[in-house]
């Protein structure tokens, strides 16, 4: 039918590209041939079909085609009017294009399926970091039968991303039938930071005065080692993961004295790739101080003991290691004063030779000027009623400053030249200042607690750059000394935590609360520099808080506060020993707001909660 229409439309005369176009030059010929076109269309079954007669005769050739001498068109050229002719190559291109599109779609879907399978495998096979679901926990460790306890130590011993709690304590146990009576025993215990369960426990031959956990191999992923210093002659290294003893210093090397202070970590002296140690022993019958260098790998002495005759009255200071900006290493120590000795001099005497490692040959000219005598090995640093010594980071410097607590107040010495940066006269200061960022100058400030009347103490924040007081408040507290701590936030601010009795409406409105009876209930208060007129009451306890530490969960940007408390019997004896943990972000949301004074505009509870909910804690050591 298409062929009939195609040949019928080839009218005589001038052809037009469109069927309905009017052309007066050819209109007459078109009228004459119109009847023939109608006859051809009516002969559907018996006449012309597909351009051929029923008898098979060839059709009459087109007059125009004969005149033009055109050849018979190919099949591909015979197409309905209005549809372009398409060569066979185009069909092949279409087929190829369809195949490429199919392959691309298949590859995309296959890649998508493989990616989804890998994601699901990672989600199920790779464990997520353990979330600290226990906002608070408390663990009772039994009755306490010893004297002074070592500070708490926080370290991730099981590599789960959460710091665990290590402490030592002495318990009283019934003796054997032959010995009779009660025998005190010392233990080193590691509690899980997740839920307070016991990870491991190890007996100690004597009571411990300090536990320090660190990696003795710098820059390695070696297992953490815990160094335990006893009150007499014990120095042992424990595997922090298992609690097994790695080595113990032979007490015969301390036959003429006892350990006077915790062990101090030094650079690598014997070049075995492990940092070494130094202990300070004091004579039993004379005030001689003896330094003993100890190998960090084996626990064996690195040379013989080195003795110094020290003249001074007061508390034992140090020893502490100080490394200057140029790399010179000094040991700070003293009795009521601060003196320094170059580690090079101790090493040369211990080895009984004139040479020392290149790392110990560096000198600090400004320190060397303070030698008491030209040939003396001792350097006079400070000598005015020293009670405590701290090393704190100095801003814009590779060295540390020396924060000295004296009977008259507080002094900050520059580490470069040992000159005073500022002094603060403050009576009644006996506890160690707590460093933290209170002002906006990125210089460490200090929280102090001083006795201020009967049953009262004053909490004070001192500006680290000038030594001026920027915040203070009197709180009721009948305990001579309670631990203070701080934690740094992501915006380079610090929250300060301290203990006091309840701040009632009467105590807030009155400046003189001396003589009030102790309530026996102590509250943990938090101070944030953004809201100096508000304290947050986070927790409370009826026991005596003997130690506290703050750790940071780096994964969840949270900080946790660990305390050790002891109960008191009516006779004044210590009873139970309790270790507790509190999540600070949880405490910030659940704590009670205590308004110290009215402000304009008034601080609302909703505004405070919105601010506190955005706080994130980071790990940044204050001391060097």
Curated annotation (Swiss-Prot):
Main location: membrane
Keyword match Phosphoprotein: yes
Gene Ontology cellular component list: Golgi apparatus; membrane; microtubule organizing center
Record's keyword annotation contains Iron: no
Keywords: Cytoplasm, Cytoskeleton, Golgi apparatus, Membrane, Phosphoprotein, Transmembrane, Transmembrane helix
Bilayer topology: Single-pass membrane protein
One Pfam family matching this protein: Beta-prop_FAM234A_B
Family note: Belongs to the FAM234 family.
Name of the protein this chain belongs to: Protein FAM234B
Naturally occurring in which organism (per UniProt): Rattus norvegicus (Rat)
